[in-house]
Amino acid sequence: MTITTQQLIALLPLLIVGLTVVVVMLSIAWRRNHFLNATLSVVGLNAALLSLWFVGQAGAMDVTPLMRVDGYAMLYTGLVLLASLATCTFAYPWLQGYNDNKEEFYLLVLIAALGGILLANANHLASLFLGIELISLPLFGLVGYAFRQKRSLEAAIKYTILSAAASSFLLFGMALVYAQSGSLSFVTLGKSLADNMLSEPLLLAGLGLMIVGLGFKLSLVPFHLWTPDVYQGAPAPVSTFLATASKIAIFGVVMRLFLYAPVGDSEAVRVVLGVLAFASILFGNLMALTQTNIKRLLGYSSISHLGYLLVALIALKSGDMSMETVGVYLAGYLFSSLGAFGVVSLMSSPYRGPDADSLYSYRGLFWHRPILSAVMTVMMLSLAGIPMTLGFIGKFYVLAVGVQSNLWWLTGAVVVGSAIGLYYYLRVAVSLYLNAPQQLNRDAPSNWAYSAGGVVVLISALLVLVLGVWPQPLITLVQLAKPLM
């Protein structure tokens, strides 16, 4: 097989991040220098982001039977790279106080980013599985990075064992699908399913097992039990990656699979997904009500957000509107989550034991860190879906696509879930403006706005507000990024 220049250009983000992994690995072997390795990682991720412009010029193509590079792949690759970049910038000040090996953190983030890019381009069940494993394996190490803390170690063990079990379900499901359809490619699978094969018991069993495996990775109810514990135990920068890059990449590839292989045409699959969405929306929001730990609260909140996205997945028959909904919602979710977890990371830096994740740590923050409090307030309002924020645009799209597809019971769940969510998001926002305690147990550095992490948080807040008022640039970008069949 000869590789053309066009194909190499199409694979640029993957090649650049892969090269960065090798360079950082050699740099660590040569000399341990935290600043140098952090800089190399950030430069590599930025170069991969910039290379997307050249990929766009090359046009859509099937690079290998496993990978398709098109506008859709570029959008999700961009979102994964942005999340990875933010994770590295939040990690740098956090690692300053960390006494064990610092440099491997960036290596693991880069390898996980490789998995995310592979998922964004996946066009085959083999590349889907490889991508999921490539993003999951480094996360085992990242979640347990603060291994001297009991919670971090416990979270890593839970995540490793449950993730391995979920992967086995996913792989067994793929085997059953292959046994029935004779293909692993999304497109060929779609042709097989179009021939009235969706009623075959073996195929439905395979799809059911795949939904279990993917449901775990997306932390949908009832496969969500690991989520709050892992979000709480993992270091704040790692929780950022878990909540954003990991979820976005996996949901992106599931959306492509459902688009090419019309799995949603099966009434049984639609009912199962509908129940998962309904349970995730209501359970995620209800459990978040009682949380006093911000990372646990955001963990339960992410369960409900994936439930909202599942509504758009079930409504995929409505075509372009559904694709647009997922793109806009995930962009809003990315920037809102980066801002919220970014504030927690800044408050927890440098590392000195457990993160500043107690709600009490943020009480009265406005009186000594007003801009940081304003940023956190904007992020909470966006996650709640309040008008004039990007979160509202995403929520509006979900409701519109639900109504358009006559999914009334799920649309009702979205409305009720959003109303419940409003309470706990506002509870976090209000606590920022109460009287500050006499003695502060945790606080962000006074120069936080001049750090790379501070800049990322401020840009996220700005994007959430600007795109909330004027979302057209984002909508146009998402419309350009439709998969070319």
Curated annotation (Swiss-Prot):
It catalyses: a quinone + NADH + 5 H(+)(in) = a quinol + NAD(+) + 4 H(+)(out). One of its GO terms (cellular component) is plasma membrane. Coiled coil: none annotated. Keywords: Cell inner membrane, Cell membrane, Membrane, NAD, Quinone, Translocase, Transmembrane, Transmembrane helix, Transport, Ubiquinone. Its main location: membrane. It is found in: Cell inner membrane. It holds the Pfam family Proton_antipo_M. Disulfide bonds: none annotated. One of its GO terms (biological process) is ATP synthesis coupled electron transport. NCBIfam families: NDH_I_N, PRK05777.1-1. HAMAP family: NDH1_NuoN_1. NDH-1 is composed of 13 different subunits. Subunits NuoA, H, J, K, L, M, N constitute the membrane sector of the complex. This is NADH-quinone oxidoreductase subunit N.
